[in-house]
From Swiss-Prot:
Protein's name in the database: UPF0754 membrane protein CYA_0973
Keywords for this protein: Cell inner membrane, Cell membrane, Membrane, Transmembrane, Transmembrane helix
GO cellular component, one term: plasma membrane
Chief localisation class: membrane
Domain of life (superkingdom): Bacteria
Signal peptide: none
Family label: Belongs to the UPF0754 family.
Lineage: Bacteria, Bacillati, Cyanobacteriota, Cyanophyceae, Synechococcales
Membrane-traversing stretches: 1-21, 385-405
InterPro entries: DUF445, UCP032178
Pfam families (UniProt xref): DUF445
Species the sequence originates in: Synechococcus sp. (strain JA-3-3Ab)
Membrane topology: Multi-pass membrane protein
Length: 406
């Protein structure tokens, strides 16, 4: 009997200390929900952590944002993630994905439609507005127009074949005998006939003076006009024979072939260039936006986009330039981030709302999952607390036995 007095207290202290700590640790998480009897909530239900999970979530978020994810740490993390090599690799990957997308006919069609809408908006909307704004400047297109005049129009000369074709077109389409006859009739008005007769009388000399003052040109010109009006077919035949007799096609061909702006005086060339520039500028100011918009509406932009994408898909220069393009873009981003990364991170942190994200994530975690996660992290530490409780209980029992021995 005396033996039980010395054995029971240490064993009882061991059992009580061990299981008391084990129960206390389990009561941190369990029960997971509240239990009620006749509407009265049983104390210690739910467990401490499930009962205070919202406050715990806010405290965890506050601790993480205050100690771990500070703006300085996020800034340093962003600099590590956005190193030039990583950005270049990411940009190269994106460009590779874009090129691979062009190889797929269905995706190429979708890309062509998107590109067509972009080109149409650029040409039909943005470009007319840009021309309208730029046209207000006095020097609008002055350099390109002058360059066009100096390098193209000033050097332009027709070769023999071009001059021959142009002369044939002029004589057959622009100035056939019928048109010449009508122009001659329109020119020979009474006023013009009087002016020609007076000019001939004043300027004629020698034998021509005698003819001019005795006969004059008035009657002859009146008869010519009357003949052209009353006998149009005969007048046209005479004009046609006259053109053949003077070999008009050959003469006109020679004139056109020798025609060049370089043969004109310098002052005339400058005046012509100025007039051309002013005419183009005035036309673009008044009609340019409408002309560009109308031209854009007449273009099949989807077809143009398909041609552009097809050319890009088979472009060896583009494929060979991917590395260089990605490197250049990465350097541009690096320079931008070096200057504005800190301010950018200060703007991003409130937008990300990381503390609320962390709190919502903790609140969304079930008590069982939360217990399992904590147990995985501190399982050994929690078991050590349980064992320590048993050890302390055993020691208390031993102390009690010592008191009994005294």
């Amino acid at each position: 009997m005396a033996l039980w007095i010395y054995v029971v207290p240490p064993l009882a202290g061991l059992v009580i200390g061990y299981f008391t700590n084990d129960i206390a640790i389990k009561m941190l998480f369990r029960p997971y929900r509240a239990y009620r009897i006749f509407g009265w909530r049983i104390p210690f239900t739910p467990g401490l952590i499930p009962q205070n999970q919202p406050r715990l979530a806010k405290q965890i978020a506050k601790t993480i944002m205050g100690s771990l994810l500070t703006p300085e740490e996020l800034h340093n993390l962003a600099r590590k993630l956005l190193r030039t090599e990583r950005m270049q690799a990411g940009i190269r990957w994106l460009l590779g994905v874009a090129l691979d997308r062009l190889q797929n006919p269905e995706q190429q069609q979708q890309t062509a439609q998107v590109l067509a809408r972009i080109l149409a908006d650029l040409f039909n909307e943005s470009l007319p507005r840009l021309v309208k704004v730029l046209a207000r400047q006095e020097t609008f297109l002055e350099g390109p127009i002058n360059q066009l005049f100096d390098q193209v129009l000033l050097e332009l000369r027709l070769n023999a074949e071009q001059a021959r074709q142009l002369s044939e077109w002029i004589l057959k389409q622009a100035l056939p005998p019928k048109v010449l006859r009508q122009n001659l009739v329109d020119f020979l008005t009474d006023r013009n006939i009087e002016a020609l007769d007076e000019e001939f009388r004043e300027r004629a000399t020698g034998s021509y003076w005698l003819v001019a003052n005795l006969f004059g040109l008035k009657n002859a010109l009146l008869r010519l006009r009357t003949y052209c009006l009353e006998e149009p077919e005969g007048a046209e035949a005479i004009l046609e024979d006259l053109l053949k007799d003077i070999n008009a096609p050959r003469r006109l061909t020679e004139i056109l072939q020798n025609l060049s702006l370089q043969n004109l005086p310098v002052s005339a060339v400058r005046q012509l260039r100025r007039a051309l520039r002013d005419g183009i500028q005035d036309y673009l100011r008044s009609q340019g936006p409408e002309v560009i918009k109308g031209l854009g509406e007449s273009i099949d932009w989807e077809k143009v986009a398909s041609l552009v994408l097809g050319r890009l898909r088979n472009s060896k220069a583009l494929i060979a330039s991917i590395d260089q393009i990605s490197a250049d873009l990465a350097l541009i981003l690096e320079r931008y981030l070096e200057r504005d990364l800190e301010s950018l991170m200060m703007q991003v942190i409130p937008v990300l709302n990381l503390d609320q994200v962390i709190a919502d994530k903790v609140n969304a975690t079930s008590p069982a999952e939360l217990e399992q996660a904590i147990q995985q992290i501190v399982r050994q530490e929690l078991q050590a607390i349980v064992n320590l409780g048993g050890l302390l209980g055993f020691l208390v029992g031993c102390v009690q036995v010592l008191f009994l021995l005294r």
